[in-house]
Every structure is written in C-alpha cells, then in structure tokens.
C-alpha cells in the first residue's frame, strides 16, 4: 500500500510550470535526466574507490535508454548509487534546499515562467515538461529494498516498495499526447534521441546505450532486413580533454548550460592545460548574467574537482578566490589523490599551486577583456564589478594592487563607466585629488549641489552608487598617489586666495547671524557656515571627516545597526537671494530666525537624500511663508 503525499508549495509551483509549460526548449529534459544518471554513477564509483570495494569496474557501468512506441514511454536507467525511500522523498518531493530560497524570491519578484524554468527547471522536474506521468524505480547500493516513486499530477506523489533486481535508478516517462503546438512523439524516435544525446550529453563518460534499428541487405539477396543493435550514442570523451581547436562555441555553450544549470550561454570561456610540477586542465566560465541567488547565502562558490576524469567534489572552494567567486567551471588533475577529503584539500600544496595559477588566469582574462573588448568588459562589470570592490574591502586593501585597475565608476564628464587610470590620465593640471560623490543612483549624484561646484572648476566627478563603493575607496586610500575626496565631506579647498579672503570677510560680517542659526538647530548640526561650495543652490549639508552620509545610510541598514550618524554641517550660499532674505529677517523680525533655520535645514536634508523628522510641519511652514509673501 502507498499513501499519497503532497508536494511542498515551491515544488508544486515549479511542477505547475513544467506541466503547463510553453517553454520552447523542452528537449533539455533528456540532458537533465542523463546528467542525474551520470552523477549517480559517479557517486557509486567514488564510493567504491574510497571503500576499496572489490569486483567493481567503472567500465561495466552504463546509462540505458529504452523507447517503447506502443506504450509511449521513454526510460532512462542507470546503475548508480540509487536512492532509498527517505532519499526519494527528499530529492523528488521537494526542490533541493539550495534552490528553494532563490525560487521563492523569483516568484515574489514576478520573474516570468520561462525565465524561472531557465533558472530552476533543471534536473528531475524537467521530466514533467514532456510526460504526464513519471515512475521512478530505485534501489540504493548495499540495501535490500527497492522503491517506486510515482506521480501523475502536480498534486502529489506516492512511494511504495517495489521489486528491483539491481542497484540504481530507472525513470519511466509516460509521454504526453501530441497537440497542435507540440509533437511529443518525436521523443520516441531513435534519430531524435541520438541527436539530443550527441548535442547535450556527448561528453558523459559513461556509455549511453539504446537499441537502434538499422536496415541492411540480407546475405546473398537484394532484399533488406531490419536489425536491432545495442548502440553507444556518445563519444564519452569529456569536453575538457579535447583540443581547444576542435571545440566549437556551441559545444562550449551547451556543455556549460548542461553542467552548471544555466539558461544563458557563458560570457567568457577559459580552457587551459597546464604541465609542470602540478599538471591539470581547467575549463572556466564567466556567466553572462548574475545568478539570481548570487548575493544570498544559498550561493556556493568553487569549482568542480576531478582526478583523472573521476569526479571528486562539486564545490572546491579553495580553487577560486572570493573576489572571483562568480567564475564557474572545473579542474581535472592527474596529480591528486582520489581519496582526498575536503579537509585535506585546504592544506594540499598541489591545490594551492593550482589555485594560484587559476587566479592569475582569471585576472589575465579580465585585463585582456578590458583592453581588447571594452563593451564586453562593461557588461561583465555591471554583472560582477561589485564583487571586485568587495575583494578590496574584505581584504582590508591587501588586494588593491591586483584589482584597482579592473574597477570602473560612472564619470560625470564622460557620461559612462571609466577606470581610475582613465580618470587620472584626464585630470587637468592643478587637480590634486580624485573627486567622487555617493548616492543611490547616478541621477541623484548628479543633483548634489557639491557636484555642481566641482564640475564648475572643470573637474570630473566619479559617482559611487553601490553600497560597497565608499568602503572600498576607504581601504584603497589612494590611486596613483592621488587621494580620494568625497565632494560632500570636509573642505574641498577649491577657492582662490581672493575667494577665501572674501568668504572670511562675509563670515565675519554675519558671525552673529550664523551663531543664532546654529543655536536654533541645536544638536542637529555640528556647525553652520557660509560656503563657496555652492553655486545655484541655497544650502547643502556637508559631513565631517569621519563617516560620510552614504556610509551612514549603509551602516544603519545592517541588522546590528548601532545608529551611526555622520556629523552634519549646514552650509549656506552667501551669494544666493535666500541668504539675503535670511539677513533681512534677522534685521527686521529676528524672532522668525528659528523657523527659517528649521526650513533651511530640512531643505538641506532632502537634498542630501535624507528623510525629515516631520514632513507635515515642514509643509505647514512653507505654506505659511507663501501666504505671508503674498500679502
């Protein structure tokens, strides 16, 4: 007897997408099921090596495809490690834990069904794109009982004991009926199956076998007869072991999509064979888009690790540095012990040698991309540039020399992303610092009053729009001996000597007024002063030399926020008509100074991107002033 169990919510949603899919690449189901069969075979082979199981040969293992046109079934059978009842429920009843978080996020963000299938419609569930019923017979290696997992809808599934002679997993797909839009019968055609295996799974290092009917002449006769032979459909040569010159872009793309569960072709491929004290082959990919889960805890960095073509582990983290964690791929070395553990890898000298060379290879690839294909590098940087910045920040600046020339920031002058080297080379004579402004968007940076002032001097301003930007620059300290200067922080020292003297005189003349405004604002500000930093704007906020305004915002968004607050200095434009109005109020109606001071401070807060304490009160004060002005 078997009890029907319901799929978990995320699994049901994904199954609904599969069952009702308009996805045009339904044929990938075979790629995914063969890939699973290969993984199961790898696991058993690895177990046999670790436990010295006698009488076990990898050459005896195969993946078998069985076509039954009469019953409209396609079967994929392996002789791998198999699953017991608990594992069937864990692996087939729910989305793998590593995928559930980002799947939920994708649904919440309203990502299209097609894109969701492209991201998550991989592995076993893809079978439901072509089948309306799926039977999975499995028996785990070393155990006596076999089980049947069965589902014909997205509502649920059953698991019951079943006879199975050998270990491994057999998946029987009951294909959907043909429709006007879809021809499911083609997956019962031997030539179509051969084509799909050749296209997607040729590199699988277990023979993929199928009974194939061919026609040949009878002996001593002109008549033909049909002959059935069990044919191996794949070459079994791993892609990375072939010569680069013999591999097409399409082959690299299809391998990447199949191996690393990506819907898109990679942006860049790095295929290298290294001979020396440690010999290895690496096949590395830079994805063309940022994975949905890239900035979540679910994302796992690292490369697949092989030894002499035998799979060892999925995420060898030590092979790729944190600042290049976006790189996917694999490494195959004949110099590694097959029984090496994850703990031993951390201290293995050969692993460290490979890791250093792989890091240099990625670094060189990015440098060449920036030099030879600017547009492609800009695309890459928009996807993964933040990771390079985090690399400098997380290393406390230790990686500055390696990564600084790969960074790009938006230029107020060029209206595009530029490198720090390009900024410095374009600096006019007399400019001593690299000016930058921080904000949520380029548009908000562009509107800052302080930016206007710096641009009026003919200086370019770099816009920092990522949360990590200022923290990264803080760790770098300088570039090419030029220090970084936040235009909203401290004294910019852009005035001529005459302008400085003029400002000193105006400050002295209005000393009492400024003191009254400061007193009115109390502990909201550190200081109130006149400034030549402003051109067309009446007021702005500047921060002291400690935490900047954007750093304050970022730090206060963190879970353990301590209420960090940057020092606020209210700067007033002495040449603006509003200041003249303030002077007039001070002379004629000094009791109103407190109200004017409050309005000016709230204005400055809004310009700097902060919220104000009481928007209603601010609105009422503005309304009152407008009414008084009309009288």
PLM-predicted stretches and their roles:
Residues 1-190, 195:
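GHKL (Bergerat-fold) ATPase N-terminal catalytic module, capturing the glycine-rich phosphate-binding loop
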Residues 116, 134-156, 176-186, 191-631:
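GHKL/Bergerat-fold ATPase module in large chromosome/replication-associated machines
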């Amino acid at each position: 007897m078997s009890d029907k169990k319901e799929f978990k919510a995320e699994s049901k949603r994904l199954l609904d997408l599969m069952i009702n899919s308009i996805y045009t690449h339904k044929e990938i189901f075979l790629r995914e099921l063969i890939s699973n069969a290969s993984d199961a075979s790898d696991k058993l082979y690895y177990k046999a090596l670790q436990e010295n199981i006698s009488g076990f040969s990898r050459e005896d293992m195969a993946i078998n495809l069985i076509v039954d046109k009469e019953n409209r079934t396609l079967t994929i059978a392996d002789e791998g490690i198999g699953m017991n009842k608990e594992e069937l429920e864990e692996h087939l009843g729910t989305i793998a834990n590593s995928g559930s978080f980002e799947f939920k996020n994708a649904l919440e963000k309203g990502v299209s069904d097609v894109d969701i299938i492209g991201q998550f419609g991989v592995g076993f569930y893809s079978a439901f794109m072509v089948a309306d019923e799926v039977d999975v017979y499995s028996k785990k290696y070393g155990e006596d009982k076999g089980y049947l997992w069965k589902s014909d809808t997205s509502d649920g599934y059953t698991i019951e004991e079943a006879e199975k002679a050998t270990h491994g997993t057999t998946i029987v797909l009951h294909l959907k009926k043909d429709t006007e839009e879809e021809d499911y019968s083609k997956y019962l055609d031997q030539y179509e199956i051969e084509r799909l295996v050749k296209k997607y799974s040729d590199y699988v290092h277990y023979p993929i076998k199928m009974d194939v009917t061919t026609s040949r002449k009878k002996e001593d006769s002109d008549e033909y007869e049909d002959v059935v032979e069990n044919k191996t459909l794949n070459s079994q040569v791993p892609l990375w072991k072939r010569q680069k010159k013999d591999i097409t872009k399409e082959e690299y793309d299809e391998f990447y999509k199949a191996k690393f569960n990506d819907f898109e072709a990679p942006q860049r491929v790095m295929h290298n064979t290294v001979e020396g004290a440690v010999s290895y082959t690496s096949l590395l990919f830079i994805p063309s888009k940022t994975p949905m889960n890239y900035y979540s805890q679910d994302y796992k960095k690292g490369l697949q690790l092989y030894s002499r073509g035998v799979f060892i582990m999925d995420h060898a983290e030590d092979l790729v540095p944190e600042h290049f964690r976006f790189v996917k791929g694999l490494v195959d070395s004949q110099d590694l012990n097959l029984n090496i553990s994850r703990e031993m890898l951390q201290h293995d000298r050969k692993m460290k040698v490979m890791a250093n060379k792989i890091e240099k290879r990625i670094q060189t690839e990015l440098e060449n991309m920036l030099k030879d294909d600017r547009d492609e590098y800009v695309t890459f940087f928009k996807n993964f540039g933040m990771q390079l910045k985090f690399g400098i920040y997380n290393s406390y600046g230790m990686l500055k020399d390696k990564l600084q020339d790969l960074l790009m920031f938006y230029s107020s002058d060029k209206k595009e992303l530029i490198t720090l080297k390009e900024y410095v080379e374009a600096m006019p004579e007399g400019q001593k610092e690299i000016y930058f402004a921080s904000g949520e968007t380029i548009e908000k940076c562009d509107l800052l009053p302080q930016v206007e002032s710096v641009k009026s001097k003919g200086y370019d301003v770099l816009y920092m729009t990522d949360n990590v930007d200022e923290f990264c620059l803080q760790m770098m300290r300088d570039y090419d001996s030029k220090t970084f200067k936040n235009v909203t922080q401290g004294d910019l020292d852009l005035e001529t000597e005459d302008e400085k003297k003029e400002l000193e005189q105006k400050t002295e003349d209005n000393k009492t007024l400024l003191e009254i405004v400061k007193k009115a604002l109390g502990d909201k500000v550190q200081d109130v002063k006149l400034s030549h930093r402003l051109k067309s704007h009446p007021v702005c906020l500047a921060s002291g030399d400690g935490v900047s305004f954007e750093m304050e915002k970022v730090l206060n968004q963190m879970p353990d926020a301590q209420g960090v607050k940057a020092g606020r200095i209210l700067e007033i434009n002495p040449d603006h008509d509003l200041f003249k109005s303030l002077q007039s109020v001070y002379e004629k109606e000094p009791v109103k100074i407190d109200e004017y001071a409050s309005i000016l401070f709230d204005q400055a807060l809004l310009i700097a991107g902060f919220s104000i304490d009481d928007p209603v009160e601010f609105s009422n004060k503005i309304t009152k002033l407008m009414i008084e002005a009309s009288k």
